[in-house]
Each structure stands twice: as structure tokens, then as C-alpha cells.
């Protein structure tokens, strides 16, 4: 295979207020848990079923850290894009432990607030940038120059 892709996209709700830590170099890191819920109807009983999956999310990107600090609280609905990483460490008894996390740390990461509890517009951050969605204007489109023929 010539290349590969490690990309995770999630839409869910924050399970508790984000945890903000500071490294020895003064860089802020945010840990949060994001719940995604899948629902379906049982074929036999016609009962509605639900399953919630909890995802560990770690944010290193300075721009996204500042957005989360200001706007994200328990219950916030988020759209996130990041990469999947598994960490390994030894606990106090010397046993190996593993955890898999969705990591947002570079310009390929994205976070969008999907509820507007704290602002009038949805705030989006990507890498070190933060901006509001621009207003979308309706534009008319002239269909007169399109052929009626199918191009294949």
C-alpha cells in the first residue's frame, strides 16, 4: 500500500467538564470524554435499543485548547476530527497498561461546537486557527448554458 490514513471523526456529547493540565514547559493539554450513542429498533421485540460508547479525547493544539477552555462544558455537543493513538505505560505494580485515545494535535485536527449555549455562532477551530462561520448568501445560478446530454 502506497499510503495510509489515520483519521477519526466523532459527533457526541462531552461527559464531564474538560480536564486542563499544564506540562513542565507551560503548554496546556486538555483531556475530555466524548459519548457517542447509537440507537436501533430490535427486530423481534420492536423495542428501541441504545448503546453508548465513551471515547477518550486529548487535545494538544493551542488553538483548540483555547476554544475548549472558553466554550466547552459537560453536555456540550462536539464534532471532532483527530487521529487514533494507543499509549502504553507501566503502572505502579509494573504491569503494562494500554489506552487508546483520539488525539487532536496538528493542522489536520478539527473541533466544531454544535450547540450554541455560549455563543450566537458555531465556533470552529482547526490547528492554531479559530474563526466563526461566515454568513452564506444565496446566489442565483444560470442553467441556460448546460447541455441536456449525458457526459458518458
Curated annotation (Swiss-Prot):
Q: Which residues form the SSB domain?
A: 5-111
Q: Motif (Important for interaction with partner proteins) spans which residues?
A: 147-152
Q: Does the keyword Mitochondrion apply?
A: no
Q: Name one GO molecular function term.
A: single-stranded DNA binding
Entry's Gene Ontology cellular component terms = nucleoid
**Cystine pairs:** none
A Pfam family annotated for this UniProt entry: SSB
HAMAP family to which the protein is assigned, alphabetical: SSB
* Assembly: Homotetramer.
What is the protein name stated in its UniProt record? Single-stranded DNA-binding protein
Q: Which organism is it from?
A: Rickettsia typhi (strain ATCC VR-144 / Wilmington)
Q: Which gene encodes it?
A: ssb
Amino acid at each position: 500500500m502506497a499510503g495510509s490514513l489515520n483519521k477519526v471523526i466523532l459527533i457526541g456529547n462531552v461527559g464531564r467538564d474538560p480536564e486542563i493540565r499544564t506540562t513542565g514547559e507551560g503548554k496546556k493539554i486538555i483531556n475530555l470524554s466524548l459519548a457517542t450513542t447509537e440507537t436501533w429498533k430490535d427486530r423481534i421485540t420492536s423495542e428501541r435499543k441504545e448503546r453508548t460508547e465513551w471515547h477518550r479525547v486529548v487535545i494538544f493544539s493551542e488553538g483548540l485548547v483555547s476554544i475548549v477552555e472558553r466554550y466547552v462544558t459537560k453536555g456540550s455537543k462536539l464534532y471532532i476530527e483527530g487521529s487514533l493513538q494507543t499509549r502504553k505505560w507501566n503502572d505502579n505494580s509494573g504491569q503494562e497498561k494500554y489506552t487508546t485515545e483520539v488525539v487532536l494535535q496538528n493542522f489536520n485536527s478539527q473541533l466544531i461546537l454544535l450547540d450554541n449555549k455560549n455563543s450566537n455562532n458555531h465556533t470552529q477551530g482547526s490547528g492554531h486557527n479559530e474563526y466563526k462561520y461566515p454568513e452564506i448568501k444565496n446566489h442565483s445560478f444560470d442553467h441556460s448554458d448546460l447541455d441536456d446530454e449525458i457526459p458518458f
